[in-house]
């Protein structure tokens, strides 16, 4: 076993006796890459109106027709647009992600969070595709961000707190290239001081920006020199201006012309050379080998996967899976037991509550029953009294119906006697009246006789 390990660690070099043909592997790789095409994803971070879209148009010499953004966005949102470009026989699928509304809010505390979430979402999407049983990475559109062009306002003073917080949050997730936007607004001397101040602040605050690789002999010299020019001071423009006998891209001012591709005026050419011509593949590789691997490792560690066991022995995926399965099984059993105990406890508590409620209801029932019996007894007593009154009333009624006839007869005879007596009295009175009248008449007639 030891000899086998030794053979693996120290392979022997052999000379071939003739031509085989694997020398064409680089050509095969190139042909396959050309057939598949390439993808490159750029994240542009900067405040609204700082020149992000103009610079991208100038970099790729194409009008991408970006939509204008408002300065009154309530929150930061990211807008991704993908384009198919072709130069000679090389196809490039370019995705430009723009931060809409970045730095426009009054409260900028969490302005960087949507950017971080977007980058993590692209890593997560690639990871989910990678762990599938049937993977389709050949046709998968890789949306992971390969480079972040961070546009810094040309204040000439120092970095804003928002810029420091954002770059600090992104430096372990994406390759950051800081840019001083609209560099034609400050003088050359101020620009050099501003560059030194920015780099000093980035180092003090521990912000890791992308450094052009110097491990390749073919590009180490130029990359090392370009690292000293960071951050790049750039100017973007698609306007063609006539300078001498040729047309150049630039900006026309009353005091002169700023040529975009003139290295004495700005660092646009340096940025294009480093970003597109020299280090585009390194940016793609750094994204996959460094930033994505860091995200993947953290995710797997969160899931419990480790490379080494408790005794510093390497663990296979199957062993890790079995260990994690047993751990999850034990955790499930423990949680089930806790849930059972909690269920029993809650049942007991509920039973106690129900028994207490039952006792209260029984006491209330007894109380209402007692009140009902008392009311019933009162009603029975009232009914008995009413019956007695009814019997007494019936007796009185019968008595009243018997005596009224006798009293009526007695009263009738007395009435007749009174009538007879009244008639006799009337007759005697009438007689008396007649006698009186006769006497008067006689008295009157006697004087007449005397006079005669």
Curated annotation (Swiss-Prot):
Gene Ontology terms, MF aspect: GTP binding
One GO BP: cell division
UniProt-listed SUPFAM superfamilies: P-loop containing nucleoside triphosphate hydrolases
InterPro entries attached to this UniProt entry: G_SEPTIN_dom, P-loop_NTPase, Septin
Region G3 motif, annotated ranges: 98-101
Region G4 motif, annotated ranges: 181-184
Binding annotation for GTP: 46-53, 101, 182-190, 236, 251
Ranges where the Septin-type G domain occurs: 36-302
Superkingdom field: Eukaryota
This protein's record includes keyword Cytoplasm: yes
Localisation: Cytoplasm; Cytoplasm, Cytoskeleton; Cell projection, Cilium, Flagellum
Record family assignment: Belongs to the TRAFAC class TrmE-Era-EngA-EngB-Septin-like GTPase superfamily. Septin GTPase family.
Subunit structure comment from the entry: Septins polymerize into heterooligomeric protein complexes that form filaments, and can associate with cellular membranes, actin filaments and microtubules. GTPase activity is required for filament formation. Interacts with ADGB.
Name of this protein: Septin-10
Organism of provenance: Mus musculus (Mouse)
Lineage of the organism: Eukaryota, Metazoa, Chordata, Craniata, Vertebrata
């Amino acid at each position: 076993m030891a000899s086998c390990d030794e053979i693996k660690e120290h392979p022997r070099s052999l000379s071939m006796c003739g031509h085989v043909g694997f020398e064409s592997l680089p050509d095969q790789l190139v042909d396959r890459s050309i057939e598949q095409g390439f993808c490159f994803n750029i994240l542009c971070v900067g405040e609204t109106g700082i020149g992000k879209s103009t610079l991208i148009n100038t970099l790729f010499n194409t009008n991408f027709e970006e939509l204008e953004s408002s300065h009154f966005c309530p929150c930061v949102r990211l807008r991704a647009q993908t384009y198919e470009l072709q130069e000679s026989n090389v196809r490039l699928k370019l995705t430009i992600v723009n931060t809409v509304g970045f730095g426009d809010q009054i409260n900028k505390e969490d302005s960087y969070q949507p950017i971080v979430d977007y980058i993590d979402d692209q890593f997560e999407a690639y990871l989910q595709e990678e762990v599938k049983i049937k993977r389709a990475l050949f046709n998968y559109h890789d949306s992971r961000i390969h480079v972040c062009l961070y546009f810094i306002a040309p204040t000439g003073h120092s970095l804003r707190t928002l810029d420091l917080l954002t770059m600090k949050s992104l430096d372990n997730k994406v390759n950051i290239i800081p840019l001083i936007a609209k560099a034609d607004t400050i003088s050359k001397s101020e620009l050099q001081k501003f560059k030194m101040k920015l780099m000093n602040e980035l180092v003090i605050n521990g912000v890791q920006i992308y450094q052009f690789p110097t491990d390749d002999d073919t590009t180490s010299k130029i990359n090392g020199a370009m690292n000293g020019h960071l951050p790049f001071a750039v100017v973007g423009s698609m306007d063609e201006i006539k300078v001498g006998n040729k047309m150049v891209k630039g900006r026309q001012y009353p005091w002169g012309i700023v040529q975009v591709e003139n290295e004495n005026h700005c660092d646009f050419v340096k940025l294009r050379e480093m970003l597109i011509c020299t280090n585009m593949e390194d940016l793609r590789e750094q994204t996959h080998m460094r930033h994505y691997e860091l995200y993947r490792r953290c995710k797997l560690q969160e899931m419990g996967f480790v490379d080494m066991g408790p005794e510093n022995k390497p663990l296979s995926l199957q062993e890790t899976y079995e260990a994690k399965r047993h751990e999850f099984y034990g955790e499930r059993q423990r949680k089930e037991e806790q849930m059972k105990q909690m269920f029993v406890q809650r049942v007991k508590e509920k039973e106690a509550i129900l028994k207490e409620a039952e006792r209260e209801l029984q006491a209330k029932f007894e109380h209402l029953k007692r009140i009902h019996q008392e009311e019933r007894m009162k009603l029975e007593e009232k009914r008995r009294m009413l019956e007695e009154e009814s019997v007494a009333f019936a007796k009185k009624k019968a008595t009243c119906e018997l005596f009224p006839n006798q009293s009526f007869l007695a009263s009738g005879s007395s009435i007749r006697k009174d009538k007879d007596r009244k008639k006799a009295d009337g007759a005697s009175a009438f007689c008396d009246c007649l006698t009186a009248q006769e006497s008067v008449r006689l008295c009157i007639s006697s004087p007449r006789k005397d006079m005669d």
